[in-house]
Amino acid sequence: FQACASEKPNIILVLLDDVSPDMFSCYAPYTPKGAEHAGNTPNIDKLASEGVMFKTCYAAAMCAPTRVELVTGRYANATGVYQNGMWSKERSAYFLEDFPSIGKLLKDAGYATAIAGKWHEGAIRPYEEQGGFDEYCIWSGLSLMEKCDNFKGWSGGMENETTISRYWNPGLIKNGKVLYTKEDDFGPEICNRFLIDFMERSVKKGQPFFAYWPCVAPHGTRQGITTNPFRGKVGEMGKSNPEESAARFKSLNEYIDFLIGRMSAKLEELGVEDNTLFIITSDNGTAVTAKTRGVERGCHVVNVISGYNVKKRGATEELTDFTDIAPTLVEIAGATPPEGYQFDGVSLVPFISGDKDTHREWIYGYISTSQVIRTKEYLIEVLNPMLGLPEGRFCYTGENRFREGYIRAEGLPEHEEARQKLLKIAEQFPPVTTAHPFWDTRRGEAFYKDYTSEASRLKHLHNHKDWIYYNED
């Protein structure tokens, strides 16, 4: 099934869940704890070496805002989605009524579209018109399962009393039907197999495909880190000792790498590897040590792009953030956004294709009311008037990318011009303050009470104790 060069390229987009770059062997040489933490990820490593691996890519520092940013190409100041519990506009949950989904744009451009895994993007489902996905296999709760005409109760896997399993014996809805799984069925493997089947059918039909895999892994369960087909007992999803939990987490990343390798192998089998763009990224940094924190590590994620029309660069110092993904896919697919619609991001096509050797001067990350802005040599993190840091924490990073070697630079005259430049960029994104109407809502009141507590404030404004490499006072 050899694809012609004149055909539109296929696209695979893999979004991993709760994992920092230091967990991947291709990033290990650049990260301070890479040798200790990284699993063996040869398939991702191969894609990185044959394409582009961004040392510095920013998402948001939590699941929902990142996913919204990815499918819309817009920051939270536009969509109103700042945190899982902070959908700040009256109809933020229905953001796809105002912001086109990348799935819908590619479908309208003639692509077969499929999604498998975790949606977590508000009230509009990916299979509805605004979502744009033709086929789906989604981890779901009981309320959605009950709407399926083949629903006959659920006796499968549970993570706790209320959460249906995403891993062993998982709860999935596949194209409108509850998928009743077995005890030894593993959610990521099912989703991977679903997308590979979709890819093969699309190639046979001669239709370009967009396969979006927002994978549930390696996110923990409600009780702990799961076992997986590479490690541990089938069905075990509860707590274990710290050493075993760390080993499971590393092993789970290695298993996901194995599944990514299966996708690469299928592309080769179908003869379309050179006509398929392959992107691997993650929604936020690792839970506990990075996720939800307003520091750089919270929003610093893996980003590997390989395949169709991608120049072999390997690790790059160029910067990118999640708003770049949508305009990149739109350009590659020849899709057309609605008239007047403007992405916040910039298409990566000129850089990844080799037409240009630079991409953009600065990138932007956020979580809750904190903002993070970076250039190649400077960083402002936890810019957060609500929590007492109206100008954030300013660092000179030089050529460093993973916190080691950063120098606090407030008050140093030789760096003041750069600090003012970052603050000027921040003016484009007015921070959320106590005057925001969200805090007057019931959800906002509850969020505010927890968020501004001393314990939450200290966690949010600082790195985890094992990841402090510069003065944070």
Regions found by a protein language model. Give the residues of each.
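Formylglycine-dependent sulfatase
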Residues: A3-G392, T397-D473
